[in-house]
Amino acid sequence: MANNASLEQDQNHCSAINNSIPLTQGKLPTLTLSGKIRVTVTFFLFLLSTAFNASFLVKLQRWTQKRKKGKKLSRMKVLLKHLTLANLLETLIVMPLDGMWNITVQWYAGEFLCKVLSYLKLFSMYAPAFMMVVISLDRSLAVTQPLAVQSKSKLERSMTSLAWILSIVFAGPQLYIFRMIYLADGSGPAVFSQCVTHCSFPQWWHEAFYNFFTFSCLFIIPLLIMLICNAKIIFALTRVLHQDPRKLQLNQSKNNIPRARLRTLKMTVAFGTSFVICWTPYYVLGIWYWFDPEMLNRVSEPVNHFFFLFAFLNPCFDPLIYGYFSL
């Protein structure tokens, strides 16, 4: 939340005993009109994303039950199921937390939930990003090395398991760095409480390194992998078509154009496009703040809220994309 980040950055003193910070500025964050609009949009997207992702899971389950007994789901549908679960997890954790936090402005839930919910928030953001990587890698291997993929039946299970495990592990530091701080004006009890990372890093570069690590894992690395995988798929298809269009038998069909594989290629490209459109504004704002914290005072509050809301569109778009292309 932008106003909380500003509050944390503005203070330069903390007590090692009780994390109490003297209130040197009379202005505390409040719920403004633009904040109310952000909350309204957040809960609308929450309902939309929950409905879309839950509907796709139900549809996938019904489709599975109609299949012949003993016949397993295709690799792609198994991966889509994991991505849907990850998106639903992000929807159920991140959006309500953001909406309620913007309503209350300060943190009332205590230090335990401060740590746990901060951990769950980052975990639920890692999971869909890593699942996007798994889908991109799987589609790339399916086109460039189809025989190798078919012979390694456990590869898909290993990649999805690794994605979940990395999400759990990489979010771990949140349990340590997030803590409660209390602002006081010197006249009595604390007048404002917040859940932040204030005084959690011994040196400034420790925090910079951690922020860059999370930024890389959530955005840069997944984006690069998706771009490389899509480029390899397009290059492989183009090369085979140029050699002999009749040799392009990627769907195990002898005479037909591989429509299923081309459809999954379009779907992975659509995933990547949605990922870039939804997350780029969010991370551009975050990087700008890292290098220039005062930018929050120069950029209007409605613009800040607008950029942050872009990230909530991704779990809404994904079920529309794979619902359109896969079923």
From Swiss-Prot:
Disulfide bonds join 114-195. Receptor for gonadotropin releasing hormone (GnRH) that mediates the action of GnRH to stimulate the secretion of the gonadotropic hormones luteinizing hormone (LH) and follicle-stimulating hormone (FSH). This receptor mediates its action by association with G-proteins that activate a phosphatidylinositol-calcium second messenger system. Signal peptide: none annotated. One of its GO terms (biological process) is negative regulation of cell population proliferation. Its main location: membrane. The chain crosses the membrane at residues 39-58, 78-97, 116-137, 165-184, 212-231, 281-299, 306-325. Keywords: Cell membrane, Disulfide bond, G-protein coupled receptor, Glycoprotein, Membrane, Receptor, Transducer, Transmembrane, Transmembrane helix. One of its GO terms (cellular component) is plasma membrane. This is Gonadotropin-releasing hormone receptor. The gene is Gnrhr. Glycans are attached at residues 4, 18, 102. It is a multi-pass membrane protein. It comes from Rattus norvegicus (Rat). Residues 1-38, 98-115, 185-211, 300-305 are extracellular. GO terms for molecular function: gonadotropin-releasing hormone receptor activity; growth hormone-releasing hormone receptor activity. Belongs to the G-protein coupled receptor 1 family. The lineage of its organism: Eukaryota, Metazoa, Chordata, Craniata, Vertebrata.
